Amino acid sequence: MFACAKLACTPSLIRAGSRVAYRPISASVLSRPEASRTGEGSTVFNGAQNGVSQLIQREFQTSAISRDIDTAAKFIGAGAATVGVAGSGAGIGTVFGSLIIGYARNPSLKQQLFSYAILGFALSEAMGLFCLMVAFLILFAM
């Protein structure tokens, strides 16, 4: 494609177009050295302006894709944070399972085992709520 443009355009137009192609859009729009030329440079300005408009159109076409990628990343991050809630459920089950086993082994320690079980339940539940809060922050605050 570059070879076809090389045959159909003047060398100055090719240089201006390639300069626009490798510069960021903000730099191409804000600081155009081609805009200050007159006379013969008007073809260069038109070529650069066409290149800028093509880059701007390309940016608008990819912005929807980048928004979709950002949305997918949000959902993946929120799903990964929600896995912590399942871990909290498993932790609560382990705490109360250990309470039952400990009570079956030594019933005289019922009160002390129960207080430790409540402490373990609270810590596990706090981690689950923290994971859920992070998931909601990822979804709705970012």
UniProtKB/Swiss-Prot annotation:
One Pfam family recorded for the sequence: ATP-synt_C
Asked if the keyword RNA-binding belongs to this entry, the reply reads no
Q: Where are the transmembrane segments?
A: 83-103, 118-138
Which key words tag this protein in UniProt?
CF(0), Disease variant, Dystonia, Hereditary spastic paraplegia, Hydrogen ion transport, Ion transport, Lipid-binding, Membrane, Methylation, Mitochondrion, Neurodegeneration, Transit peptide, Transmembrane, Transmembrane helix, Transport
Q: Which family does it belong to?
A: Belongs to the ATPase C chain family.
What mutagenesis or variant effect is reported for residue 107 to A?
In DYTSPG; likely pathogenic
Q: Which GO terms describe its cellular component?
A: mitochondrial inner membrane; mitochondrion; proton-transporting ATP synthase complex; proton-transporting two-sector ATPase complex, proton-transporting domain
Task: List the residue(s) that the UniProt entry marks as the site Reversibly protonated during proton transport.
Answer: 125
Which clinical disorder is mentioned? Dystonia, early-onset, and/or spastic paraplegia: An autosomal dominant, highly penetrant movement disorder characterized by spastic paraplegia and/or dystonia to varying degrees in affected individuals. Cognition is not affected. There is high intra- and interfamilial variability in phenotype and age of onset. Some patients have onset of progressive focal or generalized dystonia in the first decade, whereas others develop progressive spastic paraplegia as adults. Some affected individuals have manifestations of both disorders.
Alphabetized InterPro entries for the sequence: ATP_synth_F0_csu, ATP_synth_F0_csu_DDCD_BS, ATP_synth_F0_csu_sf, ATPase_proteolipid_c-like_dom, F/V-ATP_Csub_sf
Subunit structure of this entry? Answer: F-type ATPases have 2 components, CF(1) - the catalytic core - and CF(0) - the membrane proton channel. CF(1) has five subunits: alpha(3), beta(3), gamma(1), delta(1), epsilon(1). CF(0) has three main subunits: a, b and c. Interacts with TMEM70 and TMEM242.
Has the keyword Membrane been applied to this entry? yes
Under Gene Ontology molecular function, one entry of this record is: proton transmembrane transporter activity
Phylogenetic lineage: Eukaryota, Metazoa, Chordata, Craniata, Vertebrata
Function recorded in the entry: Mitochondrial membrane ATP synthase (F(1)F(0) ATP synthase or Complex V) produces ATP from ADP in the presence of a proton gradient across the membrane which is generated by electron transport complexes of the respiratory chain. F-type ATPases consist of two structural domains, F(1) - containing the extramembraneous catalytic core and F(0) - containing the membrane proton channel, linked together by a central stalk and a peripheral stalk. During catalysis, ATP synthesis in the catalytic domain of F(1) is coupled via a rotary mechanism of the central stalk subunits to proton translocation.
Transit peptide located at: 1-67
Which positions bear N6,N6,N6-trimethyllysine?
A: 110
The name this protein goes by in its record:
ATP synthase F(0) complex subunit C3, mitochondrial
Q: Which SUPFAM superfamilies match?
A: F1F0 ATP synthase subunit C
Secretion signal, residue range per the UniProt entry? none
Q: Where in or outside the cell? A: Mitochondrion membrane
Q: How is it modified after translation?
A: Trimethylated by ATPSCKMT at Lys-110. Methylation is required for proper incorporation of the C subunit into the ATP synthase complex and mitochondrial respiration.
GO biological process annotations for this chain's record? proton motive force-driven ATP synthesis
- Membrane topology annotation: Multi-pass membrane protein
Please tell me what else the database record remarks about this protein: There are three genes which encode the mitochondrial ATP synthase proteolipid and they specify precursors with different import sequences but identical mature proteins. Is the major protein stored in the storage bodies of animals or humans affected with ceroid lipofuscinosis (Batten disease).
